[in-house]
Structure formats: structure tokens, C-alpha cells
Amino acid sequence: MGEHCDGKMILFHAVYLLFLHSLLKFLKMKREDIEKLLGEEKANYLLNHQSKTISKDQLHLPNKKFIDTIWKDSNRNIQTLRNLSLIAEHGRLGGTGYVSILPVDQGIEHSAGASFAPNVPMFDPENIVKLAIEGGCNAVATTYGVLGNVARKYAHKIPFIVKVNHNEFLSYPNSYDQIMFGTIRDAWNMGAAAVGATIYFGSEESKRQIVEVAKAFEYAHELGMATVLWCYARNAAFKTPEKDYHVSADLTGQANHLGVTIQADIIKQKLPENNGGYNALNFGKTHKKVYSELTTDHPIDLCRYQVANCYMGRVGLINSGGASSGATDLAEAVATAIINKRAGGMGLISGRKAFQRPLKEGVALLNSIQDVYLSKEVTIA
């Protein structure tokens, strides 16, 4: 009798937890919540915008059946499709077509001290993975060493994206070149669902990086892993006294187009802040319609041009959350998520804003980002 009651109680708790998980997953951020956070003027600017550049009807938008609607006719093998699906089905955004990813590669890219001193527990690899799990992320993207250190404990609990190349920041004088830190085979051995890499498009070393990453992605696909490309413009000439064109829509858009050409499955890109890099720097080739018809100065339209360069959304665009600014982090993260979603993007990859604060605050920030993608009030522009 006692064993029977215990069994019923266990079943009750299991059903209750499943119900609670479903309820929390579909809590939606209301417009009034956004207005309170961003202020009415900025909220209206982002939420009321109707894009008249590239029509949303021309885009392949994120959806719960994106494997069938977008990827089934591609050359990706069955294992790669399964791993793309594994990422898409995990976390609070699982089954929506959108993704929320925690990236923590800054210990190499920016130095461990600069990255983790604000929140000392993050020196421990396990706490990085715990934040991604408790934060309801689709995946955790971090270094070869971090994931290798905890792979046996966590590879089956959250999809791993192993970042295989980095710009180490200890050489003097500092240089900007992405070099390989790990191997594709070992990423597969530790149970990774995907590998990630960075290319500095426009840099002196970019041609070598393109060849290296293209070969790495080919092997990753052969083994059945998905591929994520950090798609950054990088050249000292791109920054002028007037503007920083590293975040220009036309230059970042072309970086995206090069990235999908080497068969990245997901593109990570900085949110565009301006446009006209080609014209201001007087190099490369562009077209006047890029500026007169395909973009405006509205951030959603600039981001949509980035999406268009990802094969009109066939390859998902995730924008980065940027550096931590302190008290304004939550508002900035929510605004970035709104811009990405309304432009036709696939999600947000937010690191420093989340991991450079106590666990509960980091989880709350990640959940707020996810709430934007779950909200029916935040629509495609």
C-alpha cells in the first residue's frame, strides 16, 4: 500500500513539474512589460515599425518545422540534421524555431581576468554550463578546454557547441588572428552537437582563415555536427573618425554571405549600427539600391539586410548581445532580441551580459531574452 502511494506521489510530482515547465516555457512578455523596460518612445519605435524594404514574405522565417521546410533538401547528412534539431528542441525556446545560446569564449578572446573577475565562479567550467542549463538555453558555446573538462557529466544534458579557433590575447604586441585551438574529431568525441569558429573577414589573415574554417566545417558535417560561424568584419581601416564600419550593415551583410557560402548552418553577427561602409571606405563593390531600397536607417531594416545575406533566412542569423554595460544590460538585451526577431533572425547569443553577474541575475536576463521570442506581441516587421 505504501509503495503504491509513493508511486502515485512520484507520478503526481512528475506531472506537476512537466506542467510547471510548460507553463513557464510559454509565459509571454507583454507589450506593457517592454514599454516599462525600454520606455514608451523606444518601445514604440521598435514594436510599431513596419519594414518597407525586403518583404517578410520573401524570407524563410524560423519555425518549429525548419528542418523539414528549409534543411531537408540540403546536402547536410542525417546526423547533422539530427544535431540541428537537438539544438532547436532544447531549452525554453525548444520547438519554436528560435534559439538562445550562451557563448563563453571571452576567456581567450578578451583574457580570463577581464572576463571572469566580475563574477569569479565563472573561472570554473562547470558554472558556465550550469548557467546555460538553468538559464533555459538551447546550447552552450564555449572553448575546447571548458567543454572537454566537463563533457562526461554534461554532454547529454545540454547541446555543446565547441569553439575550435580563437584570437589569443597574450602575444605582444596584440594581433588579431584566429588560430585553431582544438580539433574537429575531439569535439565529436566529447559529444558536441556543433562546432563554432570565427573568421575576421577583411583582415590580412582572412583568406587563410576562410580556407581553414571551410575545411573544418566540411569535416564537422562529415561527422554529423552542425556548424556555427562567428562572422566578423575586422580591419583597422574599417574604423574612421566619423564611424565604426565594423558594424555597418553592408559590410556585415557581405561577411554573412561569405559565411553561408562555406556552409555555416548558423551565422553569429554583431547587430548593425550604421550603413554605407563600402562607399565611405571607397573599396569593394556595392549597388545604390542597397541603400535606397533594401535598407533604411532603422535598426530592424539594417538587421533584415543581414538576414537577406544569410540566403534570405535559410541559414539562421543570431545576433550577439555585446559587452556588459551594468544597469542597462537587461534593456539592451531585450531591445536587441526585438530587433533580431522582428527582422527575421533566429535568436540571440548573449554572453557577458549574462555570465558577468550572479547566477540568478544571469538566468533572469537569459529568460527575458527568451520571453521576447515566445511573445506573440513581438511580430515580424
Where are these regions (language model features)?
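Active-site clefts of carbohydrate-active enzymes
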Residues: 313-327
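Short, Lys/Arg-enriched N-terminal segments with co-localized hydrophobic residues
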Residues: 11-28
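Alpha/beta enzyme core
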Residues: 115-139, 146-155, 159, 165-168, ...
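N-terminal capping/small domains of soluble enzymes
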Residues: 27-159, 163
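Short acidic/histidine-rich active-site segments
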Residues: 348-355
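C-terminal helical cap(s) of enzyme catalytic domains, especially alpha/beta-barrels
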Residues: 355-380
